[in-house]
Every structure is written in C-alpha cells, then in structure tokens.
C-alpha cells in the first residue's frame, strides 16, 4: 500500500479516511469521528467487494446531518439579513366628524425601534382645503403628501377640486404603488357644500367614508371608544345625537392620555385641529414624555 498525505490508498483504488478533520472537509467540525470501514473495533476486517460502500454509509449519514444543519443555519441568517424597506414610526391619529365640524388629532412622537427620533413631528398635513393624516412609515406618508400637493396644484389650474375628487386622487396614488405599497394608513378630511367628510384608506388605496376612525399604534385601544361614543354601535335604542366641539375635544384628549399610558409610540404632545368650512383652528396638549 502507498502512503498518501490525505489517506491511505489501497490496491483497489479506494481511500480509507481516518477522520473527517484529516480529510479537511469540515474545518469547524470539533468532534473527530474515527472511520471504521467494516464496523469492527479497530477497523480491521476482511474487505469485500462492497466493503468501501458499506464502510461509507455511517460517514454519509454524518455528512448528511452536517449539511442539513448547515442549511438550517444559513436559512436563519438569510431571515435576519432579509431586505426590509419599511419602518414603523407609528404614533396615533384620530379623525371624527360631527354636525358642521371635523376634529383631527395626532401625537407628535416620531420613533423607530427603541429610539426616539423626534418629539415634535406632526402627523397632520394641510393639502389645500383638506387635512391629511398618516401613520406607519413616516417617509412614505410624507411622499404621499408631496404627491397630493403636486397633483392638486395641477388639477386646480382649471378648476378647484372638491373632497370627493381629492379622495379618488389619493386612492389612485396609493393604488399605483400596489406592488410595492406605501406603508401608510391615510385619512383625508374636508368639506363639500358645508357638509363634513372623512375618508379612511388602507395602504393600497381601498377607502370609504366614515364617521370616526383611529389609526396607528393606539388604534386597538381608542377605536372601540369612538365606536361607542360617536357611532353608538353597542348601544340599544340609542338616539343619534351630535356631540359639541368641546365634548369632542375632551373625548379625544382623554383617549390620547389613556393610550399614552400604555403605548410607547404615542407620547410627547397632542396636536388637535378643529376644521370648519374655510377655517382650521389648532391647539396643543401635553402628553407623557417618557
């Protein structure tokens, strides 16, 4: 038999490997596995014609396990390094309409993961005669706002735009990015002939007219409250009464104070806009800043 650096060659051309480390297949394999071609202690025995095949079976199983473990590890690494273009800057917004006015409110915290980026970032944008709010990825919301302003200015070269046309325009802007959607939950508010309208959207442009809506990280806590006090969805034989402007503001402030106690992304300040036809009044209230 001829000596070889990697193993020992037999006359039949086969190779008897002593250990996996000796063959240098797996440098990070910490446990040395002695190779026993016949399964006999010491590796001695009569080699038959299928001795090499029978001897490789245990090694093949070991290699298979190692390859399987390697694939599982690589899959986990791929999951960690997967491309994710979105970030949840979140916060909370509320829009509700009553009689001849609309209340639009939102907190001013801009956060990402465990970092506070800003304590004075408004989530309420004025687009012509309308108010636009958005939660989710702030950069996407701002891009939607910029596109809305641009398209409305082009439209109003000939004639002024009404709330219904603006609502359809916003839907088209969101739907145009349906294959790589804006991560933004928008609400558009405005008036048409003295009547208030609030339109709520999902990220791909589906929308509908609502009486009250809450979006963002505090939605699960605030929306049931609005459904009860504004829409009276869980009341029996409730009369359809309109709340006054002061009662609506008081309700919104209490709702945000409660959400700020439990939601880390809804903090710092509360910006409240009371919108009437051709008039917008703004007011700021303090929230928890921790």
UniProtKB/Swiss-Prot annotation:
GO biological process: proteolysis involved in protein catabolic process
Cellular localization per UniProt: Cytoplasm; Nucleus
Pfam families noted in UniProt: Proteasome
GO CC field: cytoplasm; nucleus; proteasome core complex, beta-subunit complex
Keyword GTP-binding in record: no
Main localization (coarse): cytoplasm
Role, per record: Non-catalytic component of the proteasome which degrades poly-ubiquitinated proteins in the cytoplasm and in the nucleus. It is essential for the regulated turnover of proteins and for the removal of misfolded proteins. The proteasome is a multicatalytic proteinase complex that is characterized by its ability to cleave peptides with Arg, Phe, Tyr, Leu, and Glu adjacent to the leaving group at neutral or slightly basic pH. It has an ATP-dependent proteolytic activity.
Subunit structure: The 26S proteasome consists of a 20S proteasome core and two 19S regulatory subunits. The 20S proteasome core is composed of 28 subunits that are arranged in four stacked rings, resulting in a barrel-shaped structure. The two end rings are each formed by seven alpha subunits, and the two central rings are each formed by seven beta subunits. The catalytic chamber with the active sites is on the inside of the barrel.
Protein name: Probable proteasome subunit beta type-6
